[in-house]
């Protein structure tokens, strides 16, 4: 099965998520075990488009081949991302330094198990530093950004039961905002509640 992706509206950030969900549904509903995702029509992508696809592809049991990726997708490390725990710290720092003057960081795939917490902290510090330098963020805003990222990633470590977490960010200076996407392929919020002994929540709507 060949899935040809549609381009998304760069004025509507949420359009990327719906486009990613559409692709995921096509793959899940297909009886084919071998599928191709064709990016030839893609000129613009957002973190909310790219990262859900990365997480899904890396966790999918089917054989998925990605074709016709543009230079931007190659530069951000689609589909496996940069894996800091698989390289020397100096190598990771050198890779990240290459992005210090860009408006984005590569997709970072980091260890998300509790026993790798120290590694996660070192990786997060590097990512935060690059984003702050890229945007020239003031110290008080930087503190808020670091707190937000730390809380989101700690939630993955503590509750998601996921082997890896992912983070990807792109800024849009002309539009005045920063788009950060953090994801995992864990047990979901509902699944986390169901692990509690006194849980009474049975469905997502609750």
Locate each region found by the language model.
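A contiguous, low-structure linker/loop signature
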Residues: 71-118
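Helix-loop-beta hinge of the Bergerat
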Residues: 103-137, 196-206
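A conserved beta-strand-loop-helix scaffold within acyl/acetyltransferase catalytic domains
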Residues: 171-175, 186-187
């Amino acid at each position: 099965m060949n899935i040809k992706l549609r381009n998304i509206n760069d004025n509507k950030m949420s359009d990327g998520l719906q486009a990613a969900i559409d692709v995921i549904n096509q793959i899940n509903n297909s009886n084919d075990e071998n599928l191709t995702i064709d990016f030839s029509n893609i000129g613009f992508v957002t973190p909310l488009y790219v990262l859900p696809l990365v997480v899904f592809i890396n966790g999918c049991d089917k054989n998925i081949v990605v074709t016709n990726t543009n230079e931007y997708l190659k530069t951000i490390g689609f589909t496996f991302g940069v894996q800091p725990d698989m390289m020397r710290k100096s190598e990771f720092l050198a890779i990240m330094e290459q992005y210090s003057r860009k408006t984005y960081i590569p997709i970072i795939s980091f260890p998300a198990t509790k026993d790798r917490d120290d590694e996660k902290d070192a990786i997060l510090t590097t990512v935060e530093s690059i984003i702050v330098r890229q945007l020239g963020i003031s110290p008080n805003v930087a503190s808020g950004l670091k707190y937000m990222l730390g809380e989101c990633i700690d939630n993955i470590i503590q509750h998601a039961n996921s082997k890896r977490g992912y983070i990807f960010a792109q800024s849009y200076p002309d539009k005045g905002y920063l788009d950060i996407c953090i994801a995992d392929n864990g047990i979901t919020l509902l699944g986390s509640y169901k692990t509690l002994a006194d849980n009474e929540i049975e469905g997502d709507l609750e």
